[in-house]
Amino acid sequence: MPFAGRLVLHNDPNLDNVVFRHGRAVALIDFDLASPGTRVWDVAAAARLWAPLRLDDDVQDARHGRVLHRFRLFADAYGLTEPERAVLVDAVIANHDWLYEVVQGGARAGHAGFSDYWSAARDRAERTRSWYLRATTQLRASITPQP
């Protein structure tokens, strides 16, 4: 895994794996992808899924139109250093690729959950990856500390 480290990370903090009470996240579930990693990898996974870092056309809730602002909030809330921010966008792309390789592998192996998810998410995943590559400069600028 890229960005290997010494922290134990969930690696799939999508909203289906979070338990909410009264509108607040109180627990993570489903640790089948947990592994060692770094803070940057953890922020990349969370921001990718929670900001969410994808085209506005693929965001159908109150987060629509606020992707770059929410990405900045993630970097700021985690207190990322300038060197960590410098590699965060690369980590987002690597995290996206890594997770979808896991999903594709599960689908190829006949795992029903992965197969169902991949058939529904493939097009969005491809659109999102293309957007990351087109918007890399914009994504980096959104998390660069301002003087």
What positions do the PLM features span?
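Active-site acidic catalytic loop and adjacent metal/ATP-binding pocket
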Residues: 1-42, 52
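ATP/Mg2+ or Mg2+-diphosphate-binding catalytic cores
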Residues: 99-147
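Secondary-structure boundary elements
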Residues: 21-23, 79-82
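Loop/helix-junction capping segments adjacent to catalytic residues or to phosphate/diphosphate-binding pockets
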Residues: 36-37, 68, 82
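Active-site activation/catalytic loop segments of kinase-like enzymes and analogous catalytic loops
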Residues: 43-79, 95-106
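Short, surface-exposed, polar/charged, turn-prone segments marking secondary-structure boundaries
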Residues: 36-38, 55-57, 115-118, 129
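Eukaryotic Ser/Thr/Pro-rich intrinsically disordered, low-complexity regulatory regions
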Residues: 87-88
